[in-house]
């Protein structure tokens, strides 16, 4: 379906009126998507992670600004919804989405990431590590990335540790 359908990720939140809200039917299929509604129809919201088919650029070019004066991603998602070309994937228990849309939520997200990294000794969302562990890059490519970084930085030191752990 990834070639023809849009995929939207969703999360249950306590204050959905601040986000794009997704309403579901009995079979847990999206029935509506509404941007920052005063009276949300559900507590599930889009988390800002989307996969789109190849026609997305042309569709985006045709969007018109909303009453708020913005091009709304919700309008794009609603095009796919009306055509039955959207899948909504709810985030499962154990996954976390961190809102960073207000100064307070950005601070909370930063503190959470810092705590996880300190307590577990791992980096969160280290793209080089993810690419290496998933074998999108090989040993030589990983070492080239490491060598390009300034020596003695904690990030480079971390990647060197990741590289050495593999052997």
Where are the language model's segments positioned?
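Unchanged
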Residues: 1-167
């Amino acid at each position: 379906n990834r070639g023809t359908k849009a995929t939207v990720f969703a999360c249950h939140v306590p204050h959905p009126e601040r986000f794009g809200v997704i309403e579901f039917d009995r079979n847990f299929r999206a029935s509506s998507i509404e941007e920052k509604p005063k009276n949300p129809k559900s507590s599930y919201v889009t988390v800002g992670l989307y996969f789109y088919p190849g026609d997305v650029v042309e569709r985006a070019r045709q969007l018109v600004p909303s009453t708020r004066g913005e091009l709304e991603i919700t309008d794009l998602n609603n095009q796919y919804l009306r055509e039955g070309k959207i899948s909504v994937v709810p985030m499962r228990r154990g996954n976390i989405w961190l809102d960073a849309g207000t100064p307070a939520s950005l601070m909370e997200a930063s503190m959470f990431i810092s705590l996880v990294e300190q307590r577990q000794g791992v980096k969160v969302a280290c793209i080089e590590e993810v690419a290496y562990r998933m074998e999108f890059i090989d040993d030589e490519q990983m070492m080239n990335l490491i060598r390009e970084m300034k020596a003695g930085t904690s990030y480079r030191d971390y990647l060197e540790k990741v590289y050495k752990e593999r052997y």
